[in-house]
Curated annotation (Swiss-Prot):
Assembly and interaction partners: Interacts with components of the microprocessor complex DROSHA and DGCR8.
Positions bound to Zn(2+): 21, 24, 107, 110
InterPro entries linked to this entry: PsdUridine_synth_cat_dom_sf, Pus10-like, Pus10-like_C, Pus10_N_euk
Coiled coil: 42-87
Annotated protein name in UniProt: tRNA pseudouridine synthase Pus10
GO annotation (BP), single: tRNA pseudouridine synthesis
Species per Swiss-Prot/TrEMBL record: Mus musculus (Mouse)
EC supergroup of this enzyme: isomerase
Gene (UniProt): Pus10
Residue stretches spanning the membrane: none
Localization terms from the record: Nucleus; Cytoplasm; Mitochondrion
E.C. designation(s): 5.4.99.25
Gene3D superfamilies (alphabetical): 1.10.10.2050, 3.30.70.2510, 3.30.70.3190
Molecular function via GO: metal ion binding; primary miRNA binding; pseudouridine synthase activity; tRNA pseudouridine synthase activity; tRNA pseudouridine(55) synthase activity
NCBIfam families: pseudo_Pus10arc
């Protein structure tokens, strides 16, 4: 039984006679229970036809009296009893039987979406494509894109029903109509879940996107472009100005009389159903974090390409991410880290925290043992880098790497050269300097990628180790973001004070190592 009342009968008949499908009729009658929509289309059609059939006049005749018209004998004995218990027969006029079309008409509102494209057969075909895509997933979210002209047709049907109900002193608000996407979700989500064996979840990282089109009615929206020009502005990456949001905006602005003067109400019946343009599977990004050591003084952190020409054969990013890309079967990646070192700087100690965002990965489930094996594979592939603490993390956890980045500290070891001969006593005062404030203009070497500014940084402590008349080793603990090379040589006076000005010499840096990046992330793992 359909959850429709006598009050709905006139509207249902009006829509049905204009070519609207049973499920859309339920929507316009405000049926907001999922269960009725889930019945098969043909079953709903039969139920609707029964609901709309005129009541059959039934005459209870005395048995001895002959019937005056063609009679229908009911096999059910209870139906053949009159009110006083006497046996009787019911009489039905042939003319009162509603005609039942042998073939389903394409709905003039949903263009077949709620007819052919939410039945089990269609869902099975979509799920076959999903399973063939090779993605790992434990839940799924279904995303559907309907042709924008459906909104125009729905608006026309709503105006039709609203006018009809107004004649009965009843009202129908736009929000009283169950949304097409909502009804589609009620029907298809349980079928998808059953077919794929996983729950449907609006927050799932795995998305199945189904895009519908209906070329036959593609011009339904075009009159809105003339009436509401300001709603349809060309946008980049959009094949048509008639997007769903633009159409909805125009429909909210257009006057009823203007709409009715431009578009048929009820909408005309199409000859064809919608077509499926594509079924696409995508998986949200997954994130891998760890720490890396860099042992080469001839390796950039990221690919070094100038004017399309590669300057170095590899990079830290590639040596790590290429392995992750292959194992996770991802389409691409984004690499980030807690700071960066120059091509000629080593990163020692516990390494530098890094994270890799893997986009549209096909494989996403890894045990801790599998992550250890992946780490070993990366480490065996090159003697220029090593990684540790390799682990899967959440998007939110990536924020810990960047939190308070400039308040963090880093320690360095630098080999210093001076232009004039020095003695051990000439560098001893540096050990006593604490929290030295320096002002650094953006270094000349990075002006091409960072804005010009003066940044105040802190040298928290220094420790010296004398080597010979022109060399000593300097250990520094600094505020993150300090340019160490510029602190040593002064960058033509752009860093003040600098090591040269403090010692009254010309100083330069020959070697630099990062000894620690004091960020307590990602969590250390047992080897």
């Amino acid at each position: 039984m359909l959850p429709l009342t006598e009050e709905n009968k006139h509207v249902a008949q009006l829509l049905f006679s204009s070519g609207t499908c049973p499920r859309c009729i339920l929507r316009f009658c405000g049926v907001d229970l999922p269960a009725p929509y889930k019945h098969p289309s043909k079953e709903l059609l039969n139920e609707l036809q029964k609901f709309l059939e005129p009541e059959k006049p039934e005459l209870i005749l005395e048995a001895p009296n002959p019937p005056l018209k063609k009679i229908r004998l009911h096999e059910d004995g209870i139906d053949n009893l009159s009110e006083d218990g006497k046996e009787g027969v019911s009489v039905t006029e042939d003319e009162s039987m509603a005609e039942k079309p042998s073939k389903l008409r394409v709905c003039n509102v949903c263009l077949g979406i709620l007819q052919e494209f939410c039945e089990k057969g269609f869902i099975t075909k979509v799920c076959q494509k999903v399973e063939a895509s090779g993605f790992e997933f434990t839940s799924v979210v279904l995303s559907v894109s309907f042709p924008p002209q459906l909104s125009v047709r729905e608006h026309a049907a709503w105006l039709l029903v609203k006018q009809e109900m107004g004649k009965q002193s009843l009202s129908l608000g736009r929000n009283d109509v169950v949304q097409l996407k909502e009804a589609y979700k009620w029907i298809t989500h349980p079928l998808f879940s059953e077919e794929l064996g996983v729950p449907t979840d609006g927050k799932s990282l795995f998305e199945v996107s189904v895009v519908f089109a209906h070329p036959e009615t593609a011009e339904d929206c075009h009159f809105l472009g003339e009436v509401c020009r300001d709603c349809f502005k060309p946008a980049k990456n959009k094949q048509s100005v008639f997007t769903r949001m633009a159409v909805l905006k125009a429909l909210s602005k257009i006057k009823e009389e203007d709409f009715l003067g431009q578009f048929p109400c009820p909408p005309n019946s199409p000859k064809t159903v919608c077509t499926v343009l594509e079924v696409e599977c995508t998986h949200g990004a997954v994130f891998v974090a760890g720490r890396y050591n860099k042992y080469s003084r001839n390796l950039p952190q990221t690919p070094w390409i100038i004017d399309g020409e590669r300057k170095m054969e590899s990079s830290v990013e590639e040596l790590i991410s290429d392995h992750l890309l292959a194992v996770f079967r991802a389409e691409s990646f984004n690499f980030s880290s807690s700071g960066r070192e120059d091509v000629d700087v080593r990163t020692l100690g516990n390494g530098r925290p890094f994270a890799v965002e893997l986009l549209n990965p096909h494989r996403v489930h890894f045990t801790s043992q599998e992550m250890k094996e992946l780490q070993q594979t990366i480490n065996k592939s090159s003697d220029k880098i090593q990684v540790r603490d390799l682990q899967l993390v959440t998007r939110e956890a990536i924020g810990h790497m960047k939190e308070g980045e400039e308040e963090k500290t880093k320690t360095y070891s630098a080999l210093i050269w001076t232009n004039r001969a020095i003695q051990k006593k000439d560098i001893g005062f540096l050990d006593d300097l604490k929290d030295l404030k320096i002002d650094q203009k953006t270094p000349l070497r990075v002006l091409h990628r960072r804005p010009l500014a003066v940044r105040t940084r802190a040298i928290h402590s220094m420790k010296t180790h004398y080597l010979d008349e022109h060399h000593f080793r300097l250990h520094l603990k600094t505020q993150a973001g300090t340019y160490i090379k510029e602190f040593v040589h002064g960058d033509f006076g752009r860093t003040k004070p600098n090591l040269g000005s403090l010692m009254n010499v010309t100083a330069d840096i020959l070697e630099l190592d990062v000894e620690s990046v004091d960020v307590d992330w990602p969590p250390a793992l047992d080897d």
